[in-house]
Amino acid sequence: MATIKDVAKMAGVSTTTVSHVINKTRFVAKETEQQVLQAIKNLNYSPSAVARSLKVNTTKSIGMIVTTCETPYFAEIIHSVEELCYRQGYSLFLCNTQNNPEKIKNHLDMLAKKRVDGLLVMCAEYTQNSLNLLAAFEDLPMVVMDWGPFNENTDLIQDNSFSGGYIATKYLIDNGHKDIAIISGELKKTTAVMRYQGFEKAMQEANLAINPDWIMEGFFEPEDGYECMNKILVQDKLPTAVFCCNDVMALGAISAIGEKSLKVPDDISVIGYDNIHASRFFSPPLTTIHQSKSRLGVQAINLLFKRISEKGKEHEIIEIYPELVIRKSVKTL
């Protein structure tokens, strides 16, 4: 493999001159520059990314810590982040953690060795262990996305899940539904709690009782929606509507309803959350709460780029508000 010394020898210049041509750190005569570039081409020389980063104090790379990239919601956000990084000339190191503190630590250590310019964090839940690990990297420009806590060392994007849960439930109530079930995520996790509390507030404002037998907890997967819906369907009294706290659980719930020879929305209405790309192709097309994944990703990465270039600025909280998307899975009573 060719070295910078080989390039200098072929071009008939010093290694310092080669370095200036590569890093554009000083004026070099046009003829000399062309000789160096031709030598680089002839030798197929590739400058060391690490060595260059030490000189210009940037690696043009971003680390992204996520719970998983498999779920449609996370995948759509990651896609928007990766696309913008690519357009800005940045590499993206994507690290799946499954909320495992050991994995988080190992990934953070790896990203530190890579000398990434900044860090995006998007986890389904933030344990004290993971918060402590992130705190150790407080000097690194960092944006916490979606459900993370705010502290003075990070920027934060909030998705207002409470508002989304409220909007979804109020829409069902406004369409005449009084017997409403909820299929939630784990109620020990922030995003599930916030969406449930929004549901609870809407029910209380309408003076409607919440049936404890219709409060189901899953893990935001389609099989959870399916299993939770089946637990509801074996009860003597059925709800007229179900609020599923994400779209993939709504898909599972719709499947369970169909297997009992019932129809959505004629027999049971279903509303989801997230407005994933596939939700408009459900049968029937799913009424849901829209949380712009592309906007969330773009806001986060732009905020991080801003933090990288203006490290001394006061940290920010940016809020993104959910919106109702009406399709065909909710019946008016």
From Swiss-Prot:
GO biological process entries: negative regulation of DNA-templated transcription; purine nucleotide biosynthetic process
Pathway membership, UniProt: Purine metabolism; purine nucleotide biosynthesis [regulation]
CDD domains in the cross-refs: HTH_LacI, PBP1_PurR
Residue span, HTH lacI-type domain: 2-56
Keywords, comma-separated and alphabetical: DNA-binding, Purine biosynthesis, Repressor, Transcription, Transcription regulation
SUPFAM superfamilies with a match to the protein in the record: lambda repressor-like DNA-binding domains, Periplasmic binding protein-like I
Gene Ontology molecular function: DNA-binding transcription factor activity; transcription cis-regulatory region binding
Quaternary structure and partners: Homodimer.
Domain notes per entry: Consists of two structural and functional domains: an N-terminal DNA-binding domain, approximately the first 60 residues, and a larger C-terminal domain, approximately 280 residues, which imparts the function of corepressor binding and oligomerization.
NCBIfam families the UniProt entry points to: PRK10703.1
Function in brief: Is the main repressor of the genes involved in the de novo synthesis of purine nucleotides, regulating purB, purC, purEK, purF, purHD, purL, purMN and guaBA expression. PurR is allosterically activated to bind its cognate DNA by binding the purine corepressors, hypoxanthine or guanine, thereby effecting transcription repression.
Full protein name: HTH-type transcriptional repressor PurR
Organism the protein comes from: Histophilus somni (strain 2336)
